[in-house]
Amino acid sequence: MEKLYDSYDRLHDYVRLSITDRCNLRCVYCMPKEGLPFFPTDRVLSQDEIVQLIENFAAMGVSKVRITGGEPLLRTDVVEIVRRIKAVDGINDVSITTNGLFLAKLAKPLKEAGLDRLNISLDTFKADRYKKITRGGNIQQVLDGIAVASKLHFKKIKLNIVLIKGQNDDEVLDFLHYTKDHDVNARFIEFMPIGNSLKTWQKEYVGLKNVFDTCKDNGLAYHPIVLRGNGPSDNYQIEGYEGSFGLIHPISSKFCENCNRLRITADGYVKACLYWNEEIDIRSAIGDPVAFRKLIQKALDNKPLNHEMAMSETDRIIDKAPTWRHMSQIGG
C-alpha cells in the first residue's frame, strides 16, 4: 500500500468529509445571516459516492474519517452513511461533528452504526447567548443530546467552544467547571478569519491565554495529558476533575507541523489546507482509483507548509489566496 505524503513528508491518514453544506443554525463564525444559498441536492455527494470515495482513501492508508457539514445530522441517511463507512476495510475510527440539535434522537442509532466519537458545538451555557450566537438555536435540545450521548459509552465526547471577544469569553470558568463531573473534553478554539470580514475577526478574536489565566486566578491546578484521537488540540486535566480541556490555537500557535488531514467538501472537492483557496474537483474520478489517487497526490504536492490565517497581524506576504468558502461550505 502506497500511503499519502505531502511534499513536507507529512503522512495523511485522516479525512474530514462534509456530507452537506446545509445547517439548521447560522452561527456567527460559520455562516452569514443571509445571502448564502445552499447547494442544490444533485451537487452534493450521494451516499454511494461517499462510500466509494472512502474506499479509495482506505486503499491509500487512510484509517480515520470525521463526518462534518453543515449539519451532518440533517441528512436522513446519516446513520447508514456511518454504518457503511465503518464497514470499509481499513477504516477504524469514525467520528462526527454536530451542533447536537438532533442528537437526543440519533445518538443511539449512530452508536449502533459504529460511530466512535462525537464533537458537539456548544459556545455558551446561556440560553439567550446561544440563541444570539447561533441565530435562533434552542440550547436545551443540545444539552438533552449531550445527556443522551453521555450514557452510550462513545470513545470520547468533545465540546467545541469558539471563543469570541465580548460574546462568550467570560464563560471559560463555567466550561472548566463542567469537566469536573462530566467525562468530556471541553475544547477552546480560537476564532478563525474564514468567511468573515477581516475587520470583524480582528475585533472579536481572543487568544487562549485567557484559559490558563482563568485556571490560575481560580486556583485550579492542571497538568498536560495525551488523548487518543485525531485533533490538533493541546490537552489538560484539572486535578480531581473527571473530564479535561483542550486548546486549539491556529492563530497564536499554529498546528500545521503535524497536519495529517485532507478535507472533502460536500460537492466533491479536496482541500489540502483549510485556509487556502486551492481545491481540486475529485468527484468525476471517484470511480477510477488511479485517477483519484493522482488528483489527491496533486493536492498534497501543492499543500503549503503552514496556513497564514494571522497574516493581517504581520508584515508577511501571503503566498496563496485565502479560501473564498464559508466554513459551512468547507466542513467544520
UniProtKB/Swiss-Prot annotation:
SUPFAM superfamilies per UniProt: Radical SAM enzymes
Protein name, per record: GTP 3',8-cyclase
Similarity-based family: Belongs to the radical SAM superfamily. MoaA family.
Cofactor note: Binds 2 [4Fe-4S] clusters. Binds 1 [4Fe-4S] cluster coordinated with 3 cysteines and an exchangeable S-adenosyl-L-methionine and 1 [4Fe-4S] cluster coordinated with 3 cysteines and the GTP-derived substrate.
Catalytic reactions of this protein: GTP + AH2 + S-adenosyl-L-methionine = (8S)-3',8-cyclo-7,8-dihydroguanosine 5'-triphosphate + 5'-deoxyadenosine + L-methionine + A + H(+)
Annotated function: Catalyzes the cyclization of GTP to (8S)-3',8-cyclo-7,8-dihydroguanosine 5'-triphosphate.
Top-level taxonomy: Bacteria, Bacillati, Bacillota, Bacilli, Lactobacillales
Domain Radical SAM core: 7-221
Positions with a binding annotation for [4Fe-4S] cluster 1: 23, 27, 30
EC number: 4.1.99.22
Residue positions binding [4Fe-4S] cluster 2: 256, 259, 273
Protein transport recorded as keyword: no
Associated pathway: Cofactor biosynthesis; molybdopterin biosynthesis
Claim: S-adenosyl-L-methionine is one of the keywords in the record: yes
Molecular function terms, GO-annotated: 4 iron, 4 sulfur cluster binding; cyclic pyranopterin monophosphate synthase activity; GTP 3',8'-cyclase activity; GTP binding; metal ion binding; S-adenosyl-L-methionine binding
Domain of life: Bacteria
HAMAP family, A to Z: MoaA_B
Subunit structure and binding partners: Monomer and homodimer.
Enzyme class: lyase
GO biological process terms on file: Mo-molybdopterin cofactor biosynthetic process
Keywords per UniProt: 4Fe-4S, GTP-binding, Iron, Iron-sulfur, Lyase, Metal-binding, Molybdenum cofactor biosynthesis, Nucleotide-binding, S-adenosyl-L-methionine
Binding site for GTP: 16, 66, 97, 158, 261-263
Cofactor: [4Fe-4S] cluster
Entry binding sites for S-adenosyl-L-methionine: 29, 70, 121, 192
